[in-house]
């Protein structure tokens, strides 16, 4: 796992911490998928899990997103335990899943409008299209997009709700090396475009 420097050595207040995890465990039958993770992530930080297949990266992300229950430990995301979170909390998250399921007959613009309709305060669709670099494909049907362009649309769908926090699970799957470098270079811009907490 690669991440931020040890936050205990920095002057970080609780208000700046958006993810706090202590002793996170997840057991699936006889297999301990996650074995005692501790971490803190501060607002504006980009944090990554690195490891081989089966190391528990996706399981950990799904616990933080509230899609899976943990077996043990303490977890707070945006000040809330994901296992107890409601709709308002979920609206503050943007999620790019490991694999996508886009509507192939919608255009990029239509897809973003559809998903934006699920949120109380969506971002401007044109702004999101520009942010993810799909301006020339805004009116193209999803089925005509390359794999990398579809992943950029996945990112746009995660950002259209104007989230406070974005989770990316293997977001550059399907990208060629050049597109991958561009995506990672744009990550700080995406992080800085997240809305401040209210």
Residue ranges and their predicted role:
Residues 65:
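Helix-to-loop junction immediately C-terminal to a conserved catalytic motif
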Residues 141-145:
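Conserved ABC ATPase signature
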Residues 113, 117, 122-138:
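Conserved ABC ATPase "signature" region
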Residues 73-81, 89:
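Conserved ABC transporter NBD signature motif
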Residues 166-170, 175:
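Catalytic Walker B motif of ABC-type/P-loop ATPase nucleotide-binding domains
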């Amino acid at each position: 796992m690669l991440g931020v420097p040890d936050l205990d050595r920095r002057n970080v207040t609780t208000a700046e911490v958006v993810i706090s995890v202590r002793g996170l465990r997840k057991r699936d039958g006889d297999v301990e998928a996650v074995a005692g993770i501790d971490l803190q992530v501060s607002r504006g930080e980009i944090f990554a899990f690195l490891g081989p297949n089966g190391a528990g990266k996706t399981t950990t992300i799904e616990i933080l997103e509230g899609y899976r229950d943990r077996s043990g430990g303490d977890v707070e995301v945006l000040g809330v335990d994901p296992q107890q979170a409601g709709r308002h909390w979920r609206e503050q998250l943007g999620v790019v899943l490991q694999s996508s399921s886009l509507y192939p007959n919608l255009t990029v613009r239509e897809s973003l409008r559809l998903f934006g309709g699920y949120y109380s305060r969506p971002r401007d669709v044109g702004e999101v299209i520009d942010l993810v670099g799909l301006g020339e494909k805004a009116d193209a049907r999803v089925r005509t997009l390359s794999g990398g362009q579809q992943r950029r649309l996945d990112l746009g769908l995660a950002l259209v709700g104007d989230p406070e926090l974005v989770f990316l699970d293997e977001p550059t799957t399907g990208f060629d090396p050049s597109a991958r470098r561009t995506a990672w270079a744009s990550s700080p811009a995406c992080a800085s475009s997240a809305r401040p907490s209210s």
